[in-house]
């Protein structure tokens, strides 16, 4: 397997921190043992956990107003895979990459799969793009795609999704994620019912072409790019879609795609209960779909989401097999650093949820002891589980301190010298 960071750099970085980590791990193990928790069992689950990296996430993001290019930006999907391999090598928590078509489209899929394999990466869910126009396409998505009033435009969007499935099959992917920007900006612009009927008809055509071992994830979003209405605006509509399409259709939850202050963890619980939780796009937000680093704003909410996931995992909930992926835009940070810290924050939330005293929590819930139920969750959340995460990385040939190891490696400066600088800047999220 090709390693992007020198093992000598990694060994030196780990050597300077190993003794302190050993003491911290032993100390935490003693404290958890007093609570009846086996730290090694928690570490094993954390070590086995993985979250997919979005291919577009390793490039510099932007806003509606401007995009400021960064040094060493990937020129193509092959460069992106190398950056993703750095994240996996140091965190040992991101073994798969999620591609976006047509952004990542190549003529030689065999070479792409071989590159991923050489770097120790697999390919997660495929992402279609009918929210922007690709060069040379016959019909514009300005006024919609899968729900467009024009049948030829809808057929073009359907064919694009079918192409994504074919590309995914060649790469070993097993899922298709569909998010559309379809909607309206003015009252009366769109007939809500007819637009949704057209969307469902289009999605049924895509669903019918899915291989037997594939899943399709539909993603809801309250607003943007349409600001009056979106065709798939919330989890209720998303659930209706999954029910209408069939057993291979599931709801994908992006943490930034909800109205402010929505109880996302309860939505997660509902979708688990009715066997329609497909997975997540993890990120964080303050106001809307901000696509900030996961755990950077509201780590407690992330923990509460994982509390529901671990609850389902613990009771072996029927049909529970969610896919996990990061989906962020990195405007002012090194994307590799942001994705590494985000992957670690997801792992942190998982570890914290694993140490919740579920027997005590269930008892307090039955007794309607609101305060102690809340404190039970907070006890787990306030526990510093970093020694578990770091030890899991170390034992899996990763970095105790991934960001420090990355900076010591000089990787960004090296690729900046190899990859031509992107001239100028413009608007656009990616």
From Swiss-Prot:
Classify the source by domain of life: Bacteria
One Pfam family this chain carries?
AP_endonuc_2
Q: Where does Mn(2+) bind?
A: 257, 289, 291
The protein's required cofactors: Mn(2+)
EC numbers on record = 5.3.1.-
Q: Enzyme group, top EC level?
A: isomerase
Q: Which InterPro entries match?
A: L-rhamnose_isomerase, L_rhamnose_iso, Xyl_isomerase-like_sf, Xyl_isomerase-like_TIM-brl
In this entry, which stretches build a coiled coil? none
Molecular function GO terms recorded:
isomerase activity; metal ion binding
Which keywords annotate this record? Isomerase, Manganese, Metal-binding
Classification via NCBIfam families: L_rham_iso_rhiz
Q: Which family does it belong to?
A: Belongs to the rhamnose isomerase family.
List the protein's name.
Answer: Probable sugar isomerase R00627
Native source species? Rhizobium meliloti (strain 1021) (Ensifer meliloti)
